[in-house]
Amino acid sequence: MAKTQAEINKRLDAYAKGTVDSPYRVKKATSYDPSFGVMEAGAIDADGYYHAQCQDLITDYVLWLTDNKVRTWGNAKDQIKQSYGTGFKIHENKPSTVPKKGWIAVFTSGSYEQWGHIGIVYDGGNTSTFTILEQNWNGYANKKPTKRVDNYYGLTHFIEIPVKAGTTVKKETAKKSASKTPAPKKKATLKVSKNHINYTMDKRGKKPEGMVIHNDAGRSSGQQYENSLANAGYARYANGIAHYYGSEGYVWEAIDAKNQIAWHTGDGTGANSGNFRFAGIEVCQSMSASDAQFLKNEQAVFQFTAEKFKEWGLTPNRKTVRLHMEFVPTACPHRSMVLHTGFNPVTQGRPSQAIMNKLKDYFIKQIKNYMDKGTSSSTVVKDGKTSSASTPATRPVTGSWKKNQYGTWYKPENATFVNGNQPIVTRIGSPFLNAPVGGNLPAGATIVYDEVCIQAGHIWIGYNAYNGNRVYCPVRTCQGVPPNQIPGVAWGVFK
């Protein structure tokens, strides 16, 4: 539904104040990529990559304008190549053009030719200047939307937005508040997006035998994974892709599990593999969410799994509800295991079958509750006892760091790393950039590691090579040291 001009004006003011109601608004100073500045509260980071870019603001704005029906793609210059839907019109910027408040300004020429730049018209001004609301004008991708007077240099197009005539937000609100008997609140429903990836996976030829519940070892929500992965291409998918990504109130269906396999268990695609036999769903934000938020993300996954089990005619049991660690050596699902069994596979190694069954039984109970009652509630293990999650546990997900005489911070961690699409130079004996070269870890290669280190501005993983050498491989950049370190974007996928 189109917005009124009053609603649009209110939205732009909220952007400028850093108070906009958006899931992509940064709530506190945040940094995950040392290539850019630390994002201040109020910045918009819609895809979880490269901090608060100019396009992030537009992605959020268009989602709001279209009631979450249209998600933009590409860089700023690509916005004039796509359709936002009914009511949106693309205009060339002519010498006589005076834009209206709320229009989208697109810069594609001159110094903006490579990537483009984009913002929102805050004040149409005149044919010489106008006021733009934008992000990343300074190149550091760290500020909330900021107003600036622009002289139209490089500005080639405007995108006119639909505006609804009629009552304003204030009148509508007053009308509702005058009602003596307000309508009861609707129960929140789970939104499922079927925006499938742009690659056709192999067909299974039958329904899946069950669901593997993963923890994503990442920081993105289901919507953010959709935004970053839907059109990522084969090179990224080869590093691992699940059928579903779930967070509070939202599940992204990346692949149709009823018809196609996914690459989520790391054990090949043979007829007996987890990839072939089972669907896979990621509980999102296992490395960033609070316990309370992560438990809400889990509930979305349980609710969705219950719906799929009904659709597929499956009963939740230990054969149909599976863990990633049952197929390959991995700590996944690490966060869920800590919360619901008290065992930390990252610091304590592989759990016993009894502990794995304890977690599976918890998952099974939650899924059954949704199938039978349509609802469920979380419980956690704290101090060895199961308790309600109304006061979430605060147990740390990672173990304690230690520092050696060389200034290297280190801790044990048993997991798997799948390299991205670029080779990485490894080092022998120590995690230093001037240590002897061990070779190149090829793109797409998988290694099982037992140690994590922070040294020389990088996070390293340590493992024993087949020839007996102790090898260290950098896997991302890192600012600072424990407990206040800020890791950069991972160069591959952790499982």
Curated annotation (Swiss-Prot):
Q: Which residues form the SH3b domain?
A: 412-481
Q: What is this protein called?
A: Endolysin LysK
Q: How is the cofactor bound?
A: Zn(2+) is required for amidase activity.
Ranges of residues in domain Peptidase C51: 29-160
Q: Per the entry's comment, what about the domains?
A: Contains a cysteine-histidine dependent amido-hydrolase/peptidase domain (peptidase C51/CHAP domain) at the N-terminus, a central amidase domain and a SH3b cell wall-binding domain at the C-terminus. The CHAP domain contains a tightly bound structural Ca(2+) ion and it is present at the N-terminus and is associated with the endopeptidase activity. The SH3b domain increases the CHAP domain activity.
* Keyword Hydrolase included in the entry's annotation: yes
Which terms are listed as keywords in the entry?
Answer: Antimicrobial, Bacteriolytic enzyme, Calcium, Cytolysis, Host cell lysis by virus, Hydrolase, Metal-binding, Multifunctional enzyme, Protease, Viral release from host cell, Zinc
Q: Which residues form a coiled coil?
A: none
- Binding-site residues, Zn(2+): H214, H324, C332
- One family from Pfam that matches here is Amidase_2
- Where along the chain is the active site annotated? C54 (for endopeptidase activity), H117 (for endopeptidase activity), E134 (for endopeptidase activity)
> Catalysed reaction(s)?
Hydrolyzes the link between N-acetylmuramoyl residues and L-amino acid residues in certain cell-wall glycopeptides
- Cofactor field: Zn(2+)
**What is this protein's function per UniProt?**
Endolysin that degrades host peptidoglycans and participates in the sequential events which lead to the programmed host cell lysis releasing the mature viral particles. Exhibits lytic activity against Staphylococcus aureus. The CHAP activity cleaves the peptidic bond between the D-alanine of the tetra-peptide stem and the first glycine of the penta-glycine cross-bridge. The N-acetyl-muramidase activity cleaves between N-acetylmuramic acid and N-acetylglucosamine bonds.
Q: What CDD domains does the entry give?
A: PGRP (cd06583)
- Start and end of every N-acetylmuramoyl-L-alanine amidase domain? 205-334
| InterPro entries, sorted | Amidase/PGRP_sf, Amidase_domain, CHAP_dom, Papain-like_cys_pep_sf, SH3-like_bac-type
Annotated spans, Disordered? 378-398
Superkingdom assignment: Viruses
Family, per the entry? Belongs to the N-acetylmuramoyl-L-alanine amidase 2 family.
Q: Which GO terms describe its molecular function?
A: metal ion binding; N-acetylmuramoyl-L-alanine amidase activity; peptidase activity
Against Gene3D superfamilies, the record matches this protein to:
endopeptidase domain like (from Nostoc punctiforme), Peptidoglycan recognition protein-like, SH3 Domains
Q: What is its EC number?
A: 3.4.22.-, 3.5.1.28
- Compositional bias segments (type: Polar residues): 378-393
Q: Which GO terms describe its biological process?
A: defense response to bacterium; peptidoglycan catabolic process; proteolysis; symbiont-mediated cytolysis of host cell
